[in-house]
Amino acid sequence: MTDPAGPSLRRRTAAAACAAAGLTVVLAAFSFSTSNGLPPRHHSMTSTPSPTMSSMPGMATMDGLASEFNGYAMASGTATLPAGRVTDYRFAITSPDGKPVTNFAVEQAHRLHFYAIRSDLTGFQHVHPTLASNGTWTAALAALRPGTWRMYASFVPKAGPARGQEIVLSRTVSVPGPAVPIAVPAPSRSATADGYTVTVTGKLMANRASPLVVTITKDGRPVTNLQPYLDTYAHLTAFHQGDLAFAHLHPETKVDGDHGGPTLPFHAELSRSGDWRLFLQFQTSGTVHTAAITVHAS
C-alpha cells in the first residue's frame, strides 16, 4: 500500500529529527560539569562569590578562579590537552537558565578574551576564540608544556541578569608528561622583551584601587610609536602567584593614532596581597610584543 505522506514528507521528518538530535548532543556535551571534577550544579542556583571578590558587580577584583558566577558558567568536556603541539580548547558559556550564551558585548575589540597559563605562571597565551552558532567557543592554542593549566574566559553579557557586567570564569586542564616547574622571577621594576624595556611604577595595594604607570623605552630612548592594540595602546593582565587569581588592569590612555607612549597609566585592582605576574602586550610596526614582570601587592 502506498504511503499517503510520500517520500518527500518522510525525508523532511527525518531531517527535522536529526537536527533536533544534533542540538540535544551539543547541549549535553557541556552539561556534565561546570566546576572542575564536581557533580553538575543546577543553573538556577546562585553561586556564592569568594571573599576576595568585590561586592560591587563588574569590579575588576573578581578573581576568576570559579567556573560559575551568579548562574553563569564556563562548561567544557575537555579535562586533558596534548603536549607539544597546537591544539583547540572548546567550551561554552551558559546562562542561569542553562542555555548557551551567544549574545556578548564587544570589549576591547572582541566579544570574549581567553587566557591560558601554567600553574608556575609560564606559557601565557591570550587569544580570541571563534563562536559557533550553537554557543560553542573554540580557542586555538599554541603548544602547551606538560603540567596543570588554567583556562580563563573574560566576557560581558549583552543581555540577561548580568547585562553589562564583566565576568571572568576559568577551568583547569591537565597536559600529560613530566612537568618541570620554573621558578617565578622575584619582583622587579623593569623587564625586557624584543629589545624593549618596560618599567612599572606605583604602589599596589590589595583590594584597593591603585594607579600603575608603565613606561616603555628602547635603547634608552622613549618609545612613542605604539600602535593601537585591542582599542588601547597596551593590554595588561595579572596572575597571582600560588592560586592563579586573575586581574585585568584597565588602561586609562585614550587612543590617538600610531604614536602612543612612552608612558601608559593603568587602573589596578588586585584581589590579594603577594606577588603577581604581569603580562603587558603592546604593538609596534604591526608586531605584538609581550613583556612579563613580577610585582608585589601589599
PLM region spans:
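Intrinsically disordered, low-complexity terminal tails/loops enriched in metal-binding residues
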Residues: 1-298
